Amino acid sequence: MDAAVIGLQWGDEGKGKIVDHLAGDFDSVVRFNGGNNAGHTVIVGERTYKLRVLPSGILREDVVSVIGNGVVLDPQGLLDEIHLLKKEGVQIHPGKLLIADNCHLVLPIHRELDVLFEQKQKLGTTKCGIGPCYQDKVARRGIRLCDLRSEEQLRKTLAGLSYYHNIVRKGAGLQEVCQEILFASLFAMRDELLCYAVPPCELQGILSGKSKLYEGAQGMLLDIDHGTYPFVTSGSSGLGQVMNGAALGCVNRVIGVMKGYVTRVGEGILPTEQDNAFGSELQKLGKEVGTVSGRIRRCGWCDLPLVRYVNAVAGVTEIVITKLDVLDSFNEIFLCCAYKGKKGKLIEICSPSKLCYSKYEAQYIVMKGWRSSTVGVTSFCDLPDGAKSFVETIEKCLDLPVTMISNGPERTQVLHR
C-alpha cells in the first residue's frame, strides 16, 4: 500500500523523521515537491543528518530514493549534499538514487532574483531561488535536467532564459547574464548529474510493483493555492502534487503530520502565536530554528480549525503528532478548537483566506499539563494521563485517528497506536 506524508501546518512538522521511521517498510521514498529550501532533520543514533533535497529514505541502505519531476533542483546543492553524505558513510549510487530527468534546475541567476524580490516584497523566502525557478518553469523558459544531454539544446534554452532575465536585470541595475559561465558550470556537472537521471516513463517501469512512500516538503499552509497567500511557497504541497510531481500512480494512505503546537518561519499570519513566555519556552524546548534558514521559528498553540481545513482539502486519512515531549513541562496546554466571528458565531473549520482578511478570535480548550516525561515511551497506555487526554482530544476534534506519536528526536522514538 503506497502512502504520502504531508505537513498539516507551516512546515517543520517533523515529516523527515516520520518518513525515515517508516521508510524501512517501503521499497522506495519519493520526493514530489519543493527544492533545497526545505530542510529535513533526521537523527540516527549519535548522528544528525540535515537533508535539503535528497529524500529521507537515502539513509536506508535497501530503499530506493527518487526525486520526482515536481522538485526544482539546485544541481550544485544536490551534488554537495551527495558528497557530504558519502563522506559520512552513506551509500549513494545510480540505482539507489533516481532523478526524473524533467526536473527543472535552480540556477545562480534564480537566487540573485530571489534576493532582489525579497528585499522589496518581504515574503519571508529562504532566498534559495525556488520562486524564480518556478516562474521560469511555468513561463516555459526553464532549464531541465534532460537539457544537459545535448550541448545544442542547452545553449538554445540558456539563450532564451537569458533574454528574459537580462530585461529584468537591466531594470534592477544588475549585470547581464553571462551565458558562457552558466553553460560551463552546468556542463561541468553534466556527467555526475545525468548518471542518476531517468525519464518518467522509465521510472514507472523501475518502480512498478514496488511500494512507495511519498515525502512532502513544506506544509499545506504554505501551499500556493491552499495556504496563507501571499506568504506561501511557490508550489503545491498536497495530494494533487503527489500525483503530478511524482507521476507514479495512486496513493492509498495520506499521513498528515502536525506538531502538538505550531511554528512558522518568516512572514505571514500565525493566529495562535504566543509572543510571550509561552512562545519563548516552546522555541527553547523545541529547538525551533530553521534547518535551512537558521531563523528562529515563531511559536504558538495548536490550531485545529486550520488543520481541519487542510485535512478536508488534502484528503488526509490519519494523523501523526510530533514533538509531544516538548510539552512535558507545561502546567497548562492550550488547544485552539474554534474561532469566534464578529457576531459571536463559532467557526470550527477555517480557511486561511478568511483569516487573512477577517478578524477572528481564537477559542481555546485549556488542558492541564502532565508534568512528566514522555520521551521514549513505547506504548500509548504508558503515557501520562494528561498526554493521553491531549492526543484523544485532538483525535476527537479532527475526527481522524492518531496512528503515531513522536516523543523524542531519534528515529526509534515513535510510538504506534
UniProtKB/Swiss-Prot annotation:
Cofactor: record remark: Binds 1 Mg(2+) ion per subunit.
EC number: 6.3.4.4
Organism whose genome encodes this protein: Neorickettsia sennetsu (strain ATCC VR-367 / Miyayama) (Ehrlichia sennetsu)
The protein's annotated pathway: Purine metabolism; AMP biosynthesis via de novo pathway; AMP from IMP: step 1/2
Alphabetical list of InterPro entries matching this protein: Adenylosuccin_syn_GTP-bd, Adenylosuccin_syn_Lys_AS, Adenylosuccinate_synth_dom1, Adenylosuccinate_synth_dom2, Adenylosuccinate_synth_dom3, Adenylosuccinate_synthetase, P-loop_NTPase
UniProt-annotated catalytic positions: 12, 40
Required co-factors: Mg(2+)
Any single GO BP term: 'de novo' AMP biosynthetic process
Keywords: Cytoplasm, GTP-binding, Ligase, Magnesium, Metal-binding, Nucleotide-binding, Purine biosynthesis
Residues given in the record as IMP binding sites: 12-15, 37-40, 126, 140, 218, 233, 295
Binding sites annotated in the UniProt record for substrate: 291-297
Function: Plays an important role in the de novo pathway of purine nucleotide biosynthesis. Catalyzes the first committed step in the biosynthesis of AMP from IMP.
Subcellular location: Cytoplasm
Top class in the EC scheme: ligase
Designated name of the protein: Adenylosuccinate synthetase
PANTHER family: ADENYLOSUCCINATE SYNTHETASE
Superkingdom, taxonomy of origin: Bacteria
Gene3D superfamilies: Adenylosuccinate Synthetase, subunit A, domain 1, Adenylosuccinate Synthetase, subunit A, domain 2, Adenylosuccinate Synthetase, subunit A, domain 3
Family: Belongs to the adenylosuccinate synthetase family.
